[in-house]
A protein has these predicted regions:
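Short phosphate/oxyanion-binding micro-motifs
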Residues: 1-121
C-alpha cells in the first residue's frame, strides 16, 4: 500500500495535475490526500488524471474562504470501504485492506488559517 499527503497550495494549474498523474503511475499509489486545494468542485476528467487513470473513489471538502479544501481519493480495488465521514476540517475513511484484512482509518486534516476560525478547529 502506497499513498501521499500533499499540501498543494491550490490545485488549478496543469503542472500540478501532470505531477500528480506521473507520481501516481510511477509509485502505483493506492491513496492520495491533497490539502489546501482551494477548490469547491472537481470534474471527472481532473480526478481521473490525478490518479493516473485508476478508478479511485473521491471525497472532498470545500475551502473556507480563500484557504483550505481537502481532496481524498482511494483505490477501491485495494481497500474495502467501511464508511466516509466529513467534518469542517477533515475527511475520515474507515477501510480494510483486501490483501490482509487489516482495518484502519485514513484521515486527511487541514486546520483553519484564519484566526477567527482557529477556535473551532
Amino acid at each position: 500500500m502506497k499513498g501521499i499527503f500533499w499540501n498543494s497550495r491550490g490545485l488549478r494549474d496543469l503542472a500540478k495535475f501532470r505531477f500528480l498523474s506521473d507520481l501516481s503511475k510511477e509509485k502505483n499509489l493506492d491513496f492520495i490526500a491533497l490539502l489546501e486545494t482551494g477548490r469547491k468542485n472537481f470534474i471527472d476528467t481532473e480526478l481521473n488524471n490525478i490518479c493516473g487513470g485508476k478508478n479511485f473513489l473521491w471525497s472532498w471538502i470545500d475551502p473556507k474562504g480563500r484557504s483550505g479544501g481537502i481532496l481524498l481519493g482511494i483505490n477501491p480495488s485495494v481497500f474495502c470501504i467501511g464508511f466516509i465521514s466529513q467534518g469542517d476540517y477533515h475527511i475520515k475513511i474507515r477501510m480494510r485492506n483486501k490483501v490482509d484484512g487489516f482495518q484502519w482509518n485514513l484521515i486527511a486534516v487541514y486546520g483553519a488559517a484564519q484566526a477567527e476560525h482557529k477556535k473551532s478547529f
